[in-house]
């Protein structure tokens, strides 16, 4: 949605292009698709375990095993989806193909037919998750490519995550408002999802700033994916993202059980989720300003410390501690805003630095760039590093690995935490002291320990993940020449 009266683009001035893309209409249009995608994610990761365990009578251990199996399948395919995105870097096309499949699958998952069991759950989870992955990988790569400066990339991510948090709040609040029972409420939620997906999806596809032309990837699948992991900064950012992500995934898989059986306030589960995500949405402008003052990485560190300081108290709560838990939801929600916006923005900056290095190599080496490209085509991008030139990071491959880690975290959280609770004697509806203590420990204390690990890793690798200075063309050219001796 650019103003037809605006001046013609000046290709020699990237900042001017960035300013045009950053107009409010463009930012809002890009972010719009984040709403239905997040609206779909919350029921998948929060409501589905309880829906199939309590509503359909499957055992908690069986539901956990099915979730683990489906998410392992899904996670393994994400890097391949990312590689395919690089081979055919048409972000809008991938999204347009994925959204109808996602809509149909969500209806089947949240409104299962009579007699649906573990096989139905597995099949629909795989279908929905694959469609969701195709859409989100292309969508995230689009956002990373359209911003020309670090500030622009942060704003595109913040727009996407602001819409996403609105979608999460709607998905958390609506089931209880649509019907008295959770089963009926989730079934109606699925039918509300379809027009949301169509409307917001079309808004983004038609009105968002067009992604820039991106050279198609040429490396074989494994070579391209391995090249991404071979980049030290990306590999370390991914490791921190994994450690931090599983710390957040365990509470997501167990929160409704905690509210129902530890706090004994099942009817308030939706309200607590709304508090959590509204606080996260409200915090996005704050984290944007903090990141501009102290850097994105240090702002993320501050949010992790806040999350640990607040969530450490959750495992000590008991029946009736509703005000205390509400305060924990609000304060940990503030920390969530940074978790959602800053890591993808750091990844977008890594991709931009890689593009700057490749661009500088082209100017510095002239025809040797063609030689490097030929090597890349024949032997894969990983081989380019052997020739002394930086292996360029591809957005699709990186976001494929990013989604892989996200899904692996959720798979481990559901596939390990739920069976662990069963082994420790907890079953949905249990009220004895030993069972609720086990649930409180898994929900509150395990994530805090994992978050400490993420903090330590991020601090250790801070200089590599977020260098003090961006890569300037002369420096990038020097990197290209390094290794040529």
Where would I find each of the regions flagged by the language model?
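Membrane-embedded alpha-helical bundles of multi-pass transporters/translocases
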Residues: 19-359, 371, 383, 389-480, ...
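Short, Lys/Arg-rich, polar N-terminal cytosolic tail immediately upstream
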Residues: 2-23
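Long, intrinsically disordered low-complexity tandem-repeat segments
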Residues: 364, 368-386
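Intrinsically disordered and other compositionally biased segments
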Residues: 10, 16-17, 379, 388-391
